[in-house]
From Swiss-Prot:
A molecular function GO annotation: protein dimerization activity
NCBIfam families reported for this sequence: AntRepSinIBacil (NF046031)
Protein name: Protein SinI
Organism: Bacillus subtilis (strain 168)
Quaternary context: Heterodimer with SinR.
Length: 57
C-alpha cells in the first residue's frame, strides 16, 4: 500500500545516461560522489579572476 503523501521526481535523462555509462565503466557510486563534491561550483561565484595583470603605463 502506498503512502497518502507521495512525491513525484522527474529524472534528468542526461544524468541517467551518465550514471549508466559510469556503471558500465565500473566507476563506483562513491567515486562519482567524491568527484562531484570536489568539483562542485558555488552558487555564488566570487570576483572574476584575471588571466593577466593590466599595466596602464
Amino acid at each position: 500500500m502506498k503512502n497518502a503523501k507521495q512525491e513525484h521526481f522527474e529524472l534528468d535523462q542526461e544524468w541517467v545516461e551518465l550514471m549508466v555509462e559510469a556503471k558500465e565503466a565500473n566507476i563506483s557510486p562513491e567515486e562519482i560522489r567524491k568527484y562531484l563534491l570536489l568539483n562542485k561550483k558555488s552558487a555564488h561565484p566570487g570576483p572574476a579572476a584575471r588571466s593577466h595583470t593590466v599595466n596602464p603605463f
